[in-house]
Amino acid sequence: MEEDVINILKSIGEDPTREGLLNTPKRVKKAYEFLTSGYRADITKIVNGAIFEEPTEGMVLVRDIEMYSLCEHHLLPFYGKAHVAYLPNKKIIGISKIPRIVDVFARRLQVQERLTEQIAYAIQEVLDPQGVAVVIKAKHLCMMMRGVEKQNSELFTSCMLGAFKENMVTRSEFLDLIRTGST
């Protein structure tokens, strides 16, 4: 990968041997290894048995999970917040595992639509809840820095499974909570 970065630098008219760029290929390689580490992550190891029997029936919501990813079309970042909820089915998951699941899928080349669904279906698979809801709000640098150059644009995506899809009251409660944060 380092040689590829050197070639990119040359192709845009830069001198990869100048002082400020000498370590750039190594830094870019390290950055991309981190930013794509989701390909090498295993959800089972992430969850690591942190699923607990619990008779609770109320909605569990982790709101404002900071996330960033790379647009698969331009390799430019998009970033924002994910809101993830589930309705337990006699089991709950350790709350830190939800942001970790978000990171697994965000640290891949992505489109936001697929990212949203992958998070929802992963939680559905490991927890088998009555329902899962995921909403992501993000800014895409590929729209802000190039192309249409709309700096204030935001993309919202959602995936509703089970009770969140079938029951409008449940869906409305979730949407109200992510809008206002009130209980």
Swiss-Prot record:
<comment type="pathway">
    <text>Cofactor biosynthesis; 7,8-dihydroneopterin triphosphate biosynthesis; 7,8-dihydroneopterin triphosphate from GTP: step 1/1.</text>
</comment>
<keyword id="KW-0378">Hydrolase</keyword>
<dbReference type="InterPro" id="IPR001474">
    <property type="entry name" value="GTP_CycHdrlase_I"/>
</dbReference>
<dbReference type="GO" id="GO:0005525">
    <property type="term" value="F:GTP binding"/>
</dbReference>
<dbReference type="GO" id="GO:0006729">
    <property type="term" value="P:tetrahydrobiopterin biosynthetic process"/>
</dbReference>
<dbReference type="GO" id="GO:0003934">
    <property type="term" value="F:GTP cyclohydrolase I activity"/>
</dbReference>
<dbReference type="InterPro" id="IPR043134">
    <property type="entry name" value="GTP-CH-I_N"/>
</dbReference>
<comment type="similarity">
    <text>Belongs to the GTP cyclohydrolase I family.</text>
</comment>
<dbReference type="GO" id="GO:0006730">
    <property type="term" value="P:one-carbon metabolic process"/>
</dbReference>
<keyword id="KW-0479">Metal-binding</keyword>
<protein>
    <recommendedName>
        <fullName>GTP cyclohydrolase 1</fullName>
        <ecNumber>3.5.4.16</ecNumber>
    </recommendedName>
</protein>
<keyword id="KW-0862">Zinc</keyword>
<feature type="binding site">
    <location>
        <position position="71"/>
    </location>
    <ligand>
        <name>Zn(2+)</name>
    </ligand>
</feature>
<feature type="binding site">
    <location>
        <position position="142"/>
    </location>
    <ligand>
        <name>Zn(2+)</name>
    </ligand>
</feature>
<dbReference type="InterPro" id="IPR018234">
    <property type="entry name" value="GTP_CycHdrlase_I_CS"/>
</dbReference>
<keyword id="KW-0554">One-carbon metabolism</keyword>
<comment type="subunit">
    <text>Toroid-shaped homodecamer, composed of two pentamers of five dimers.</text>
</comment>
<dbReference type="GO" id="GO:0008270">
    <property type="term" value="F:zinc ion binding"/>
</dbReference>
<keyword id="KW-0342">GTP-binding</keyword>
<dbReference type="GO" id="GO:0046654">
    <property type="term" value="P:tetrahydrofolate biosynthetic process"/>
</dbReference>
<dbReference type="InterPro" id="IPR043133">
    <property type="entry name" value="GTP-CH-I_C/QueF"/>
</dbReference>
<keyword id="KW-0547">Nucleotide-binding</keyword>
<dbReference type="GO" id="GO:0005737">
    <property type="term" value="C:cytoplasm"/>
</dbReference>
<feature type="binding site">
    <location>
        <position position="74"/>
    </location>
    <ligand>
        <name>Zn(2+)</name>
    </ligand>
</feature>
<dbReference type="Pfam" id="PF01227">
    <property type="entry name" value="GTP_cyclohydroI"/>
</dbReference>
<dbReference type="InterPro" id="IPR020602">
    <property type="entry name" value="GTP_CycHdrlase_I_dom"/>
</dbReference>
